[in-house]
Structure formats: structure tokens, C-alpha cells
């Protein structure tokens, strides 16, 4: 299990769990561009809200991973087209946008659920939970 994050505090929390073989303080696109990728699963929770355009993430996983696999991830959800930078400073992504990336890079959308992800200042944040096969 490998973990990457830009937040030192999140990496410290991960380190304290003692389950990771490797932890790196890096940008996700840089990591996917430079590391040998041979994973069955990519799991990304509360990450894509800081990325916005997921084109390179989807492209790099599909083109650089040595085997077939699955991607499980969450997004903050929007019904607008594409992805939107919200007032919170986080990005939300539409299901239609994720489906367009799936079509472009030949991923299969196996599961989607719109749900309450978390509560911030007393208000639920609506998110999308996805499972893709590639």
C-alpha cells in the first residue's frame, strides 16, 4: 500500500496507522507521471476536490499502470457541467464529467452513488462515490 498527499499532517496520520509500505509528499500527477505503476486498486478519497481537472489523472493511470484494475474515489458533486471551483476553494465534479473521462480513456463505470459525504458547519456536502474498472 502506497500513499501520497500534499499535506504533511495527513501523511503523519497515515504514518501512525502503520499500514503503508511507502508514503510520499508529492502531487498526484507528478507521482503518476514518474513512478512505476503496478496496482490492482487506486483509492482516492477527499483528493479530487483539490485537483479540479482530472484528465491527466485518468490518462496516466490508464496509460502507465501495468495491469488492469479498479479506481474507487469520491468527489464533491455538482449538477453543473464539468467541474466547478466552489466558494469553499474545493472542486466539485459532475457525474457527466466523470462519464466523459470514462468514455475517453475506456474505463467502465461499475458503481455510482450520490450521498452525503460529510458535514461542514452544520451543512451536509453532497458527494459522488465511484468505482471504475479499467
Segments (PLM) and residue ranges:
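Class I SAM-dependent methyltransferase SAM/SAH-binding core
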Residues: 1-31
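Local beta-strand N-terminus motif with an aromatic residue
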Residues: 20, 38-40
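A conserved beta-strand element that flanks and buttresses the S-adenosyl-L-methionine
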Residues: 43
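Hydrophobic adenine-recognition pocket in adenosine-nucleotide-binding enzymes
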Residues: 47
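A short glycine-rich, Lys/Arg-flanked "PGG" loop and its adjoining helix->strand segment in the class I
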Residues: 55-70
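Short, glycine-/aromatic-enriched active-site segment of Class I SAM-dependent methyltransferases
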Residues: 73-91
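Short alpha-helix
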Residues: 90-106, 112
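Core SAM-dependent methyltransferase catalytic element
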Residues: 116-134
Amino acid at each position: 500500500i502506497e500513499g501520497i498527499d500534499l499535506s504533511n499532517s495527513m501523511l503523519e496520520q497515515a504514518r501512525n496507522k502503520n499500514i503503508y509500505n511507502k508514503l510520499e509528499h508529492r502531487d498526484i500527477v507528478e507521482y503518476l507521471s514518474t513512478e512505476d505503476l503496478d496496482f490492482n486498486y487506486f483509492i482516492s478519497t477527499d483528493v479530487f476536490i483539490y485537483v479540479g481537472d482530472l484528465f491527466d489523472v485518468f490518462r496516466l493511470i490508464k496509460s502507465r499502470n501495468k495491469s488492469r484494475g479498479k479506481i474507487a474515489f469520491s468527489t464533491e458533486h455538482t449538477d453543473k457541467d464539468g467541474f466547478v471551483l466552489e466558494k469553499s476553494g474545493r472542486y466539485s465534479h459532475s457525474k457527466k464529467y466523470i462519464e466523459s473521462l470514462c468514455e475517453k480513456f475506456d474505463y467502465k463505470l461499475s458503481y455510482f452513488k450520490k450521498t452525503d459525504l460529510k458535514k461542514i458547519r452544520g451543512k451536509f456536502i453532497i458527494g459522488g462515490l465511484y468505482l471504475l474498472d479499467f
